[in-house]
Amino acid sequence: MKKITGQVKLQIPAGKANPAPPIGPALGQQGVNIMEFCKQFNAKTQAEAKEALIIPVVITVYADRSFTFILKTPPAAVLIKKAAGLHTEKKKGSGAKKPGKEKVGQITRAQLEEIAKKKIQDTTAASLEACMSTIAGTARSMGIDVVG
């Protein structure tokens, strides 16, 4: 068994990993071959690249400078924005400015269930209903109504 020297958690747009910040500095400090990671990540996330999703990744670095990584499901907020038809890029900021008072969109119960099915493996929710409840709360805090 290899000795683990570090773990790096990043959120990278699917299919767009490159050696520029934040990826380069984070992996360079660990002694990882940055280009090798970028090639592998981009190859594995090619399918999601068309949807412009942000993919969380956990990179485990070993003593011999080798690495493995695990892809997680996109953040619930990104999936909710996509379902509501809002901008998914971070810079566009498409949530409500005043979430309790202002509504910026809505998603259906079926869309909520679809998001929960994707996210359930990465959450601590005991059931699909519990996961749906958590994601509905995230949607409300963004100013998005759940209808149906």
UniProtKB/Swiss-Prot annotation:
Name of encoding gene: rplK
Transmembrane segments: none
PANTHER family the UniProt entry points to: 60S RIBOSOMAL PROTEIN L12, LARGE RIBOSOMAL SUBUNIT PROTEIN UL11M
Subunit structure and binding partners: Part of the ribosomal stalk of the 50S ribosomal subunit. Interacts with L10 and the large rRNA to form the base of the stalk. L10 forms an elongated spine to which L12 dimers bind in a sequential fashion forming a multimeric L10(L12)X complex.
Species of provenance: Myxococcus xanthus (strain DK1622)
UniProt keyword list: Methylation, Ribonucleoprotein, Ribosomal protein, RNA-binding, rRNA-binding
Phylogenetic placement of the source organism: Bacteria, Pseudomonadati, Myxococcota, Myxococcia, Myxococcales
NCBIfam families: L11_bact (TIGR01632)
GO molecular function: large ribosomal subunit rRNA binding; structural constituent of ribosome
Post-translational modification: One or more lysine residues are methylated.
Domain of life: Bacteria
Protein name (record): Large ribosomal subunit protein uL11
Function: Forms part of the ribosomal stalk which helps the ribosome interact with GTP-bound translation factors.
An annotated GO cellular component: cytosolic large ribosomal subunit
CDD domains, sorted: Ribosomal_L11
GO BP: translation
SUPFAM superfamilies: Ribosomal L11/L12e N-terminal domain, Ribosomal protein L11, C-terminal domain
Family: Belongs to the universal ribosomal protein uL11 family.
